[in-house]
């Protein structure tokens, strides 16, 4: 049936609905928001373009309408108030998620739950813990977008199609994330070797510049236009495609870890096999010892916040 429900019709939720409608992968898309008028307006606006794309039924609904959904995407959440700490915001969003997830589970406990709201790693773990859903059926957008930014910036440097660049940003979707430089390659050629071939410099300063631009990307965009939503909507579309097409594609989604690199009791991003039933497997990359240590530090950052939450 390929039915999707999107909880939250803000910038990210509405743009995700539009992007999914354009993709033609869903037969039904439901928009649900506390502001019903906003959801109805977005649904109408997108629906009026359906004659130009593949047929799709798109409408605003309520929690009862998530029944029969194959994927439930959650983009809803509170925005940070002036002077509010990150931890206070996390606590507020945790309370919001407890309410949302409880309502959703009553209606649909067979869907795959895809979390997009930030901080996505923490809220993915919160959803997993309070939903009682089987492992693999709760995942977050994680560093799928960060990895795309990484490949894009490398593609500009190397003048190569980003689809031919293989590299990952892993760990937290946030300031403690890390680039897995030790395995980054172009057509199987390690990035340092490729840079030598094309005459481009790939010294430490180059790596720092690329990585810092990845980490700072959202801040830069928010400073210029107030929010990010186009690229993340495309990242969500890519995850949805992998699920509906049962691709077993490798994407850096966020999910509860089960001992990878010695890490448990936290959700973080690692390259994961994604198919019809959600996460099939999490891959452990042959990282350097320095990268493994950085990944574990990223886990501790998230764990320290989770320990402050009532879940």
Swiss-Prot record:
The active site is at residue 173. Its EC number is 1.1.1.27. Keywords: Allosteric enzyme, Cytoplasm, NAD, Oxidoreductase, Phosphoprotein. One of its GO terms (biological process) is lactate metabolic process. Pathway: Fermentation; pyruvate fermentation to lactate; (S)-lactate from pyruvate: step 1/1. Substrate binds at residues 80, 86, 118-121, 146-149, 228. One of its GO terms (cellular component) is cytoplasm. Its main location: cytoplasm. The modification Phosphotyrosine is found at residue 219. Beta-D-fructose 1,6-bisphosphate binds at residues 151, 166. It catalyses: (S)-lactate + NAD(+) = pyruvate + NADH + H(+). It comes from the Bacteria. It is found in: Cytoplasm. InterPro entries: L-lactate/malate_DH, L-lactate_DH, L-lactate_DH_AS, Lactate/malate_DH_C, Lactate/malate_DH_N, Lactate_DH/Glyco_Ohase_4_C, NAD(P)-bd_dom_sf. It is an enzyme of class 1 (oxidoreductase). Gene3D superfamilies: Lactate dehydrogenase/glycoside hydrolase, family 4, C-terminal (3.90.110.10), NAD(P)-binding Rossmann-like Domain (3.40.50.720). Disulfide bonds: none annotated. GO terms for molecular function: L-lactate dehydrogenase activity. NAD(+) binds at residues 12, 33, 38, 63, 77-78, 116-118, 141. Allosterically activated by fructose 1,6-bisphosphate (FBP). CDD domains: LDH_2. Catalyzes the conversion of lactate to pyruvate. Belongs to the LDH/MDH superfamily. LDH family. Homotetramer. This is L-lactate dehydrogenase. The lineage of its organism: Bacteria, Bacillati, Bacillota, Clostridia, Thermoanaerobacterales.
């Amino acid at each position: 049936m390929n039915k999707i429900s999107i909880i939250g019709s803000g910038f990210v939720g509405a743009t995700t609905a539009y992007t999914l409608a354009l993709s033609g992968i869903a037969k039904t898309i439901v928009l649900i928001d506390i502001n019903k008028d906003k959801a109805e307006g977005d649904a109408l606006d997108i629906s009026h373009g359906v004659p130009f794309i593949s047929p799709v039924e798109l409408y605003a609904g309520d929690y009862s309408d998530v029944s029969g959904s194959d994927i439930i995407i959650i983009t809803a959440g509170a925005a940070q108030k002036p002077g509010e700490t990150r931890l206070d915001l996390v606590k507020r969003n945790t309370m919001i998620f407890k309410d949302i997830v409880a309502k959703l589970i009553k209606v649909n406990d067979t869907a795959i739950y895809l979390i997009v709201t930030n901080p996505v790693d923490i809220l993915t773990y919160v959803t997993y813990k309070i939903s009682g859903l089987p492992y693999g059926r709760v995942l977050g957008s994680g560093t799928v977008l960060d990895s795309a930014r990484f490949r894009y910036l490398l593609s500009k440097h190397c003048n190569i199609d980003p689809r031919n660049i293989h590299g990952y940003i892993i760990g937290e979707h946030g300031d403690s994330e890390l680039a897995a430089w030790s395995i980054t390659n172009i057509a199987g050629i390690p990035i340092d070797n490729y840079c030598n071939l094309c005459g481009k410099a790939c010294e430490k300063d180059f790596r720092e510049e690329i990585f810092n631009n990845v980490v700072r990307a959202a801040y830069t965009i928010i400073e210029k236009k107030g929010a990010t939503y186009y690229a993340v909507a495309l990242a969500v579309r890519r995850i949805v495609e992998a699920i509906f097409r049962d691709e077993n594609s490798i994407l850096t989604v966020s999910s509860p870890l089960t001992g990878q690199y010695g890490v448990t009791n936290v959700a973080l991003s690692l390259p994961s096999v994604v198919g019809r039933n959600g996460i099939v497997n999490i891959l452990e990359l042959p990282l350097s010892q320095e990268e493994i240590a950085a990944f574990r530090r990223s886990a501790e950052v998230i764990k320290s916040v989770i320990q402050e939450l009532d879940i």
